[in-house]
């Protein structure tokens, strides 16, 4: 009888171990489901971040395109202004190459200077009176 008791005791301990293994398997599957749920949440967060980055990238691209158009317009206007300035400089060169033109330019400059002096004197007199 002692042998049967020992046999039953060893059998019980043997099956208790299997019960523990089966529970472990259940725990493993529960842990697997938990890990899957965590992975799904992480994937959703990643998708949200990717879509956010995609929107930001689109906004940046649109802003860059707007700035490129603006820079093109500014560049075209600068080229136009450069052309006008070079034409004006060429005309001044033509005027100052001839002596008669040089004399008339000096005369005009003296009149402009005289006009400015008179203007400031009149303003000064009005300031003193007022």
Curated annotation (Swiss-Prot):
The chain crosses the membrane at residues 107-122. Gene3D superfamilies: 1.20.5.110. It is a single-pass type IV membrane protein. Residues 33-95 form the t-SNARE coiled-coil homology domain. Residues 1-106 are cytoplasmic. Its main location: Golgi. Signal peptide: none annotated. Keywords: Coiled coil, Endoplasmic reticulum, ER-Golgi transport, Golgi apparatus, Membrane, Protein transport, Transmembrane, Transmembrane helix, Transport. GO terms for biological process: endoplasmic reticulum to Golgi vesicle-mediated transport; protein transport. GO terms for cellular component: endoplasmic reticulum membrane; Golgi membrane. InterPro entries: BET1_SNARE, T_SNARE_dom. It is found in: Golgi apparatus membrane; Endoplasmic reticulum membrane. GO terms for molecular function: SNAP receptor activity. Residues 40-82 form a coiled coil. Belongs to the BET1 family. This is Bet1-like SNARE 1-2.
């Amino acid at each position: 009888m002692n042998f049967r008791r020992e046999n039953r005791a060893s059998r019980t301990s043997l099956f208790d171990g299997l019960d523990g293994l089966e529970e472990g398997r259940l725990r493993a599957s529960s842990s697997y489901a938990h890990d899957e749920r965590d992975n799904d949440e992480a994937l959703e967060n990643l998708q949200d971040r990717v879509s956010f980055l995609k929107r930001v990238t689109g906004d940046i691209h649109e802003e860059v395109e707007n700035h490129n158009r603006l820079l093109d317009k500014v560049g075209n206007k600068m080229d136009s202004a450069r052309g006008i300035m070079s034409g004006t400089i060429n005309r001044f060169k033509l005027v100052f190459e001839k002596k008669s033109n040089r004399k008339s330019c000096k005369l005009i400059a003296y009149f402009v200077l005289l006009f400015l002096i008179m203007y400031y004197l009149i303003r000064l007199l009005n300031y003193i009176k007022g």
